[in-house]
């Protein structure tokens, strides 16, 4: 009897560690290979004239050009802007939890009620920009730190940083090649590596393109 209790408790602890005991957890979007099964509608949460809006649209266009070049019908969807404010303290906490790769409570109602599937939050907070996925409602949230903070003040960094986080949102993970878009932890490259006085998006690796082809094949369709 004692052995049976130990086994059951061990399984419960394992399930808790894997986020299996509750469906109300947010998952850090680091692991690669989880693609969209529909065209995600995008909602940008930002002040009306936020200077990061052009970089956000450029990053979305970069990915849609990439999908066209790969021959897949998948695209990032229509873009809507709302001027709601997500508390910077919440985004800072969420960023820290994503970095720790831990499960955490699902997005609050303020976020869940926002329109769209993919939320790009242009914040005034100071945190590590991140991407997180809701396990309950299917929303993905990309949090972008203040444009007044280093290294987002450097030329060419902002559009590449947003494109990098959108890369996570569409299913790509990190690599260790600092000359490419998806380089990131645990490799030492950070967003300042995107600095350039020539406007350009950093490239994808061949492996990134192979993975995108698997997630979004030429016969991809919404389901």
Give short role names for the model-derived ranges.
Residues 1-4:
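Positively charged n-region of N-terminal signal peptides that target proteins for export
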Residues 23-31:
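Signal peptide processing junction and immediate N-terminal pro/mature segment
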Residues 41, 71-73, 181, 223:
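Residues at or immediately flanking beta-strands
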Residues 53, 57-169, 173:
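Metzincin-family zinc-dependent endopeptidase catalytic domain
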